[in-house]
């Protein structure tokens, strides 16, 4: 999934309960982005949309949320910045996040099929490891922010998300449609 299929409930220790603005330029960037990602991922429809884009187009959920985070401040992520961000994430994604996700999903399916609490605990542990790897991706993205231009948040998000999806090989028209859909979910309450 993205953000490790964390179930965002009141008792979730990973769910952040307050909203805050973005401060681009260091450790606060990482924490602000991570908080934004958790909050927005918890919004109705966002997780499902992100996971669908991940599964259908190979989109990186953290990169999608990063585009939305930067758009929150009116910054559009350009193609060159997307390519750089994708290159920064690729080794971690290929060697850690995707294998953890695949293992977690397989174990979760087995736990459900066999009604096995022990396997469910194993899947939950893998989910925590996947979440830690995604947090590392958030750090890489926040630390490498550059090549942005200003504009309205939702419009920038739609544009940046469409560019991100096109980078995954999605047809331009579909990328624009899916980008606009996710931008609406992220920014509309």
Regions found by a protein language model. Name each.
Residues 33-54:
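Short amphipathic alpha-helical segments and their helix-coil junctions
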Residues 47-90:
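N-terminal interaction modules that seed assembly of large macromolecular complexes
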Residues 106-185, 189:
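A charged, amphipathic interaction segment
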Residues 84-99, 163-171:
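Short, mixed-charge aromatic SLiMs
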């Amino acid at each position: 999934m993205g953000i490790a299929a964390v179930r965002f409930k009141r008792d979730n220790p990973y769910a952040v309960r307050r909203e805050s603005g973005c401060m681009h330029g260091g450790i606060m960037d990482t924490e602000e982005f991570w908080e934004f990602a958790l909050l927005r991922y918890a919004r109705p429809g966002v997780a499902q949309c992100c996971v669908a884009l991940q599964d259908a187009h190979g989109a990186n959920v953290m990169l999608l949320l990063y585009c939305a985070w930067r758009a929150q401040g009116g910054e559009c992520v350009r193609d060159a910045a997307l390519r750089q961000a994708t290159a920064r994430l690729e080794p971690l994604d290929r060697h850690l996040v995707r294998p953890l996700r695949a293992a977690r999903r397989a174990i979760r399916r087995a736990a459900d099929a066999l009604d096995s609490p022990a396997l469910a605990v194993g899947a939950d542990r893998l989910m925590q490891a996947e979440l830690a790897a995604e947090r590392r991706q958030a750090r890489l993205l926040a630390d490498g922010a550059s090549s942005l231009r200003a504009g309205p948040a939702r419009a920038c998000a739609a544009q940046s998300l469409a560019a991100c999806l096109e980078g995954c090989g999605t047809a331009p028209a579909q990328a624009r449609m899916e980008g606009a859909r996710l931008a609406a979910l992220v920014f509309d309450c």
